[in-house]
A protein has these predicted regions:
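Charged, amphipathic alpha-helical coiled-coil/dimerization segments
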Residues: 103-163, 257-317
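Short, conserved sequence motifs enriched in acidic/basic residues, glycine, and aromatics
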Residues: 48, 64, 81, 92, ...
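A short beta-strand-loop micro-motif that forms or neighbors metal/cofactor-
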Residues: 157, 161-179, 311, 318-325
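N-terminal positioning helix adjacent to the helix-turn-helix/winged-helix DNA-binding module
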Residues: 38, 68, 130, 157, ...
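N-terminal leader segment of winged-helix/HTH proteins
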Residues: 1-63, 163-217
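N-terminal helix-turn-helix DNA-binding core of bacterial DNA-binding proteins
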Residues: 51-97, 108, 191, 209-249, ...
Length: 325
């Protein structure tokens, strides 16, 4: 199958006319004072580690199967004859995403659906022979993705990382119990609570949801990352910017294009290379960045509210090491 591009909510961010003094300093050519890195660190590192996981997946896993598709195969291999709702809860995916996955994988002959006994409106799911063969062929490669992702940590720190991420995501070890003999494979635990890639995805989904609650549609987290990086490193080019914010060149270019159109970023020719454009924040861009600071802090607070301050710092350090994999 081909790949396909997966507490109390805060008040959405409103547009405010107030300006931060740094915006005026920047406009006047003075020294700027961008927000502290820690305000955005968790979300940015989670996004980067998710991208590392996706890169490893593309490098190692054959056949064009996606991580969510394999997760469906894995769950149904461990617990056949569950319904679609139970599958979605086990994968931490919304109803629409699970329905689309199940429909496409059913059409591809990887899973089968049968009406549940005594409930004509409910279908149970299980792997077909083809689905079982595909799972068996992919499993060793998927295990390598998880092992490569955490290779920089070592066994002890990996265990610590998993425990911290279980707290962040509220994924409880032992909540997903296999009903068939588990496939014993180093790097591919039967319990998703011990799967680093799964925990990173669930945490990233939470961050995205919290960001929408707090900031709304005014500014996306990747756009904020670009503004923040340019506040800290004014005058870098687009290639350098993409590297700094851990985004592929094309998506980074689209973000810069949109922010430039909104008057929040400006491009100027490099005096030493006329073909190269240098990027800086405008006073408007700096003002927008400071407007989102309270909301960004609320996102981080919600995401890490069950961690102590020391645990949060430890998680940041571990995510930072994983982001360089």
């Amino acid at each position: 199958m081909p790949r396909r591009a997966a507490t109390r909510p805060a008040t959405p961010l409103a547009r405010r006319p107030s300006r931060h003094p740094a915006a005026d300093e920047t406009a006047a050519g003075g020294e700027s004072h961008p927000p502290d890195e820690a305000v955005f660190a968790v979300g940015g590192l989670l996004r980067t580690v998710q991208q590392v996981h996706d890169r490893l997946w593309q490098e190692l896993v054959p056949g064009g199967y996606t991580s969510p598709q394999f997760a469906v195969l894995h769950r149904l291999r461990m617990r056949p004859d569950i319904d679609q709702r139970t599958l979605g809860e086990g994968l931490s995916l919304d109803k629409a995403t699970v329905a689309d996955l199940v429909a496409r994988m059913d059409q591809a002959g990887l899973i089968g659906r049968e009406r549940a006994a005594g409930d004509a409106g409910r279908y149970t799911l299980r792997l077909t022979g083809t689905g079982r063969a595909v799972f068996t062929g992919l499993a060793p490669w998927v295990a390598q993705v998880q092992l490569r992702l955490t290779a920089a940590l070592g066994p002890q720190d990996t265990g610590r990382f998993l425990r911290l991420m279980q707290t962040v995501t509220s994924v409880i070890p032992g909540a997903w119990t296999p009903t068939t003999p588990a496939l014993v494979l180093i790097g591919l635990p039967a319990d998703p609570a011990h799967n680093p890639g799964y925990l990173v995805r669930v945490a990233q989904q939470r961050h995205t949801r919290y960001w929408a609650d707090a900031v709304g549609t005014r500014l996306t987290a990747p756009q904020q990352g670009v503004l923040h990086r340019l506040a800290r490193e004014p005058g870098i080019d687009q290639t350098t910017l993409a590297e700094r914010v851990a985004l592929p060149k094309a998506p980074a270019g689209e973000i810069v294009k949109r922010l430039t159109a909104r008057g929040e970023v400006q491009r100027t020719p490099d005096p030493h290379d006329g073909r190269r454009k240098l990027l800086t924040l405008t006073s408007k861009g700096f003002n927008v960045l400071y407007e989102v600071m309270p909301a960004a802090r609320e996102v981080q607070r919600r995401l890490t509210q069950d961690l102590t301050a020391d645990e949060r710092d430890e998680l940041l350090a571990l995510l930072g090491r994983l982001s360089k994999a």
